Amino acid sequence: LRNNSLAALCPALPEVQSYFRKVTERLIRDYDFDGSKMDYIFSVPRCYNPAHHHKSPDDSVRAVADVYKIILETSKALKPYSVTQICPCGTTPNLAWLPFENQAVTADPVGSIQVRRRIKLYKALLGPRSAVYGDHVELSKIRFDPNREVDLGEDFASTVGTGGVLGTKFTWPDYGNRFDDVFLTPRKEAIWKQWIPIYNSMMLSKGTFMNLYTIGYDSPEGYAIAKDGKMYYAFFVSEAQAWEGSLDLRGLEQGTYRVFDYVNQKELGSVDASSPRLQTKFTENLLLEVSRQ
């Protein structure tokens, strides 16, 4: 499909659906993979092949979801914990196949803002406890050179703080100039070693996304996750921008709460739910754990 160099199987054919069932069985059962990421091919053209005897050329388009359903159900039957992702590569998700993935993908975000807002989008569409992959953290900052895309992102906070599933595409050892932007240098390794344990220990991706802040209206940009009797807040401003003021910690039940900066391991005092305002300052982002005292 890309540059007319690829062909697509017609998903409306029973033979094609059977083929994908067998491929999935081979990958999950025989090769012991733990899931699938369907990348780039998230739709197909209309099919005008008379040998297929379609009632409509759109039969092929409608049947895409049937194939994804087969892949998801076959994977889960073989491995209940398997992950099925569908990546629409920078385009909007298709409502037809959304039910047939168990981990949505933010799909090639260009910068941190798109990571955060697409996570919120998917939480709205799929439910507040749905799993949403924040895509490779390297995509949180991108530079476009004349001949290639250079992925420079290190913004783990935009995925962790919004309740997304963390990911990275670092390379090691050094494979040369083609992958120099994603090579795990000693400097980057220190950052990765800070954030991955934070994600693994807190697992905010399994919490409940609370729709308490409105993008474009509330400033700074805010998110809230409820998990294990605690509230986790994340606030963001533009890159390298400093912010100072009073944060509104919404959604707290009656009582007094301890406020803790869990990234920098810093106590920030306490707030009362009757007036949950926190006077503070930060640069770029601030991630908080708020627990009842």
Where are the model-predicted features located?
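Active-site groove signature of glycoside hydrolases
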Residues: 19-53
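Core alpha/beta catalytic barrel or barrel-like domain that forms the active/cofactor pocket
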Residues: 1-6, 34-46, 85-90, 131-132
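Aromatic- and acidic-residue-enriched carbohydrate-binding clefts of CAZyme catalytic domains
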Residues: 1-15, 42-71
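Active-site-adjacent "subsite" loops/lids of carbohydrate-active enzymes
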Residues: 1-30, 107
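Composition- and surface-driven signal marking solvent-exposed, interaction-prone regions
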Residues: 60, 245-249, 273-274
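C-terminal beta-strand-rich structural cap/linker in extracellular carbohydrate-active enzymes
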Residues: 269-293
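Active-site-proximal substrate-binding groove within the catalytic cores of carbohydrate-active enzymes
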Residues: 68-266, 279, 284
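Short, well-ordered alpha-helical packing segments
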Residues: 21-28, 65-76
